[in-house]
Each structure stands twice: as structure tokens, then as C-alpha cells.
Curated annotation (Swiss-Prot):
Annotated GO MF terms: ATP binding; kinase activity; magnesium ion binding; melatonin binding; potassium ion binding; pyruvate kinase activity
Name of this protein: Pyruvate kinase 2
Reactions this protein catalyses: pyruvate + ATP = phosphoenolpyruvate + ADP + H(+)
UniProt site positions, description: Transition state stabilizer: K242
Name of the coding gene: PYK2
Residue sites binding K(+) per the record: N53, S55, D86, T87
Nucleotide-binding keyword on record: yes
Top-level enzyme category: transferase
The organism of origin for this protein: Saccharomyces cerevisiae (strain ATCC 204508 / S288c) (Baker's yeast)
Residues annotated to bind ATP: N53, F54, S55, H56, R93, K179
InterPro entries, per database record: Pyr_Knase, Pyrv/PenolPyrv_kinase-like_dom, Pyrv_kinase-like_dom_sf, Pyrv_Knase-like_insert_dom_sf, Pyrv_Knase_AS, Pyrv_Knase_brl, Pyrv_Knase_C, Pyrv_Knase_C_sf
Recorded metabolic or biological pathway in which this protein acts: Carbohydrate degradation; glycolysis; pyruvate from D-glyceraldehyde 3-phosphate: step 5/5
Length: 506
């Protein structure tokens, strides 16, 4: 009988585990962290993926982040990081208030929401511009409109005409210029990409970004539209679909079919859906991604108090840990690293929390669940990945070394959540960067030229992988390692599994 989760928890040894963290950390770079020195410090603390938030900042700013990231990379030879572009997406916002003043709105206050653009720069507490032309066509009396992440709620009283509706404030608060607007339980018909998004994606392609975090994805067609917009030059960019509204939830299965991965963006999701339900939604979506073998990111307010405080709340630590236990491949920091006072400390706390959470996982029981739930027959590569995970569990192996061109084998290995690190050896920098999306994968760039002797070339790459694992304290002489490689060069031939002993074969 495999060790159950309950048995695993009852027998836990409390303290810092003697292993490396497998959950990746994504950090948003903002004005406080946009320097080579700051990015290097974040990487040393545990950062794996840089996020560029295109809801803020100029092209010049984002260009400088990319340049600083490239400079920082030189201090980590063979360990490239990934850069992700987070689109602004099809958001709805209020207009600019008169003189940019913050408008106080008392409870029960009635006012007009208008789509008349003549009020776009002169909104006041009597009439407020909303930049969604079809607002009066999609909403009905009795529905609610949330402003500024739900800080202010309004009930729709009357549709006056095609441009105006009357609302009543449910609570008191302030409205400032250009605040976000949410329409819960209302199907909006915004295009998946705005003109700004198109320009931003073109910027990303030109500057070699590796991942797109696509905001407010509602259908599979939205994902395909982004893929088309990236064009042939951006065909290798991975698309991570952000699920942050009811439409995205309703169409999740079709989105998962076509996307490269998923981000659970709990901020906007928690506005449109009851906050307690987000807990269950997070677990459900992560499980679906795990079963599909696609990476999933948990994001929003994970260590939010550390924006201004040196220590997180206990609830925040539990939130990070539970996201890891739910099965997230990556956890993400937003304002904590973009504008916070303690960015490096936030990454350190997140890394330490993820590491301890990982030590509580009952890997054999988890592997059995994943294997049993996977439809059969599986592809050759996935069959080998599952067999490698089983071999590690049965032989108490310390590492899996995989030689890969595209990283697909490493992704499938990650799906089965082996109890050891996955050492990815690749000659392709983009493959190494993208691998940070997959839990447990440690990518290493192998730069020597390919030998004419295929067998010798394979041996040298495997030896390199074992040496890298040894240098990071993952393996030592006498340890068992499992390796996966192809019987010939090229893509899609990972079909050979080998069990070796460190210090003998390598």
C-alpha cells in the first residue's frame, strides 16, 4: 500500500527540507526592481520567470526590463530565465474624473453611467463615463456593476436609453479616474484583443519574449486569436490563458484544449464570483490542468501585505502553501516585487513556503492518482515518462535526467510529479526558458556542438546533466538516476529509459 497523504502528514519531520524547491516563482518587475542588480538579487532569492505587466509602463520601460534581465543572465551561465508579457486585455474602465479628483460616493447615491464619449474626460458624481459601448445592451435592471476591484458596488435601476443607465450605490466609497469595471453574471462581447494588445504582442515578438499571459480569456477562439496575432515569428511563444471571469469558467474545458497553460487570476475572479467559491474553483482548475499535463499558475495577492511589511500574514503563507499542495506549477508575485518595499524578502518567503509545502506531498499516492486518471493508451513519450517516475519511486532514485529538443518530455515527466528533480539538458535556450513553467524541472543549457558519433554525444550530455545535478547537491556517488533520451536525433523520439548509478556510468 502506498503511503497515504494522512500517513505522510502524521510522520512529517518539521524543519527545512534537504531538497531543492520545485515550484517556480514568477515575479513582476516594476520601477523598484528594474535594474540588473535588483533582478540578479531576485534570481538568487529564487525567481524563475519575469513578468512584464502591460497594463502599466511604457515600451521604453519594458524594453529596459528585458535589457536588464539579459545582463543579469550573464551571471547565471547555462541557466536562462523566461520573460512573460501580461496583456492588458479587454478591460472595461471608468472615464477620467473632472480635474482627476477622487469622487466620494455615499451609500444609496443615484447617478448615471454613460457610454457617451463626450463625458470621457469630465466624469463627476452625477454622470460617470464607462468605456464599453454595449453596456446598456448586455445588462438589465437588478444586476450589479463593480468598480475598482469591487470596492464600490452599484445596482442597476433603469436603462434610460442606448447610452445611459441609472444606478444606485450599494456602499460608500471613492471613484478615481480610469478604474476597472466588472459586470458579474453578464456576458460581455468585447474583442479578445484590443488595438493596444495587438501592438503589445508585436513588441513582445520583436523583443523575443517567451510567454504570453493572456488576460480575460473567455473562449477557445480568444486563444486562437492571440495565436494568430503572434504570427509565424511568435509561433514558439507559449500562451497562458488567464481565467478571471464567469465566461472563462463556463468554457474552461474548451480553453484548456487549445492553450499551453492556465493562470488562475483570483483578483478579478473573486469579484465576479463569491470569494469562498474561488477556493473550490482554484482546486478544480488546478486538478484539470494536472490531469491534462499543462502548467498552471496561481496568482494575485499571494503575499500582498509584504508590499509594505517585511513579514507576511500567516494566512498568506498558508495561501501560498495550499496553492502548492493543490498542484500549482508556479506561484506569482505582483505588487510585492513591482512596487513593494521588500521584493527580495517576498521571493525568499515564497520560496521557503513552497519548499516546505512540497515536503508534505505523498508522491506515490499522487502518482497512482495521476496514472489511473490518465486515458489509455498514452503516447510513447508519455509512457516512458510515467515509467521513469515509477522507477524513481521504486528505487528511491534521486534525479531524472532528460535530453530534449522541445521540452515536451520534461513537461510530461512533470505531469507525473516525481519525487525527485527533473534535470533537463537541452541545446535550445528557448526550451530551457519555457521549462520553468513545469514543476520540478531544472533546465540546463548544453552548449558544446553536436558530435558526429550519436552515442558519444548522448553520453556526454547525460554526464553533463549528472554533473549539474551534483553541483546543486541533488545527487552524489552511489545514487540512482533515471535517464531518458531518444534512439536517434530530432524531435519526438524520446523512447529510451535507462537506470544508472552516479559514480559508475557517469
Amino acid at each position: 500500500m502506498p503511503e497515504s497523504r494522512l500517513q505522510r502528514l502524521a510522520n512529517l519531520k518539521i524543519g527545512t527540507p534537504q531538497q531543492l524547491r520545485r515550484t517556480s516563482i514568477i515575479g513582476t518587475i516594476g520601477p523598484k526592481t528594474n535594474s540588473c542588480e535588483a533582478i540578479t538579487a531576485l534570481r538568487k532569492a529564487g525567481l524563475n520567470i519575469i513578468r512584464l505587466n502591460f497594463s502599466h509602463g511604457s515600451y521604453e520601460f519594458h524594453q529596459s526590463v528585458i535589457e536588464n534581465a539579459v545582463k543579469s543572465e550573464q551571471q547565471f551561465p547555462g541557466r536562462p530565465l523566461a520573460i512573460a508579457l501580461d496583456t492588458k486585455g479587454p478591460e472595461i474602465r471608468t472615464g477620467r474624473t473632472l480635474n482627476d479628483q477622487d469622487l466620494y460616493i455615499p451609500v444609496d447615491h443615484q447617478m448615471i453611467f454613460t457610454t457617451d464619449a463626450s463625458f470621457a474626460n469630465t466624469s463627476n458624481d452625477k454622470i460617470m463615463y464607462i468605456d464599453y459601448a454595449n453596456l446598456t445592451k448586455v445588462i438589465v435592471p437588478g444586476r450589479f456593476i463593480y468598480v475598482d476591484d469591487g470596492i464600490l458596488s452599484f445596482k442597476v435601476l433603469q436603462i434610460i436609453d442606448e447610452s445611459n443607465l441609472r444606478v444606485q450605490a450599494v456602499n460608500s466609497g471613492y471613484i478615481a479616474s480610469h478604474k476597472g469595471v466588472n459586470l458579474p453574471n453578464t456576458d460581455v462581447d468585447l474583442p479578445p484583443l484590443s488595438a493596444k494588445d495587438m501592438k503589445d504582442l508585436q513588441f513582445g515578438v520583436r523583443n523575443g519574449i517567451h510567454i504570453v499571459f493572456a488576460s480575460f480569456i473567455r473562449t477557445s477562439e480568444d486563444v486562437l486569436s492571440i495565436r494568430k496575432a503572434l504570427g509565424s515569428e511568435g509561433q514558439d511563444i507559449k500562451i497562458i490563458s488567464k481565467i478571471e471571469n464567469q465566461q472563462g469558467l463556463d468554457n474552461f474545458d474548451e480553453i484548456l484544449e487549445v492553450t499551453d497553460g492556465v493562470m488562475i487570476a483570483r483578483g478579478d475572479l473573486g469579484i465576479e464570483i463569491l470569494a469562498p467559491e474561488v477556493l473550490a474553483i482554484q482546486k478544480k482548475l488546478i486538478a484539470k490542468c494536472n490531469l491534462a499535463g499543462k502548467p498552471v499558475i496561481c496568482a494575485t495577492q499571494m503575499l500582498d501585505s509584504m508590499t509594505h511589511n517585511p513579514r507576511p500574514t500567516r494566512a498568506e503563507v498558508s495561501d501560498v502553501g495550499n496553492a502548492v499542495l493543490d498542484g500549482a506549477d508556479c506561484v506569482m508575485l505582483s505588487g510585492e516585487t513591482a512596487k513593494g518595499d521588500y521584493p527580495v524578502n517576498a521571493v525568499n518567503i515564497m520560496a521557503a513556503t513552497a519548499l516546505i509545502a512540497e515536503s508534505t506531498i505523498a508522491h506515490l499516492a499522487l502518482y497512482d492518482d495521476l496514472r489511473d486518471a490518465t486515458p489509455k493508451p498514452t503516447s510513447t513519450t508519455e509512457t516512458v515518462a510515467a515509467a521513469a517516475t515509477a522507477a524513481i519511486l521504486e528505487q528511491d532514485g534521486k534525479a531524472i535526467v532528460v535530453l530534449s529538443t522541445t521540452g515536451n518530455t520534461a513537461r510530461l515527466l512533470s505531469k507525473y510529479r516525481p519525487s525527485c528533480p527533473i534535470i533537463l539538458v537541452t541545446r535550445h535556450a528557448r526550451t530551457a526558458r519555457i521549462a520553468h513553467l513545469y514543476r520540478g524541472v531544472f533546465p540546463f543549457l548544453y552548449e558544446p556542438k553536436r558530435l558526429d558519433d550519436w552515442g558519444e554525444d548522448v553520453h556526454r550530455r547525460l554526464k553533463f546533466g549528472v554533473e549539474m545535478a551534483r553541483s546543486f547537491g541533488m545527487v552524489d556517488n552511489g545514487d540512482t538516476v533515471v535517464s531518458i533520451q531518444g534512439f536517434k536525433g530530432g524531435v519526438g523520439h524520446s523512447n529510451t529509459l535507462r537506470i544508472s548509478t552516479v559514480g559508475q556510468e557517469f
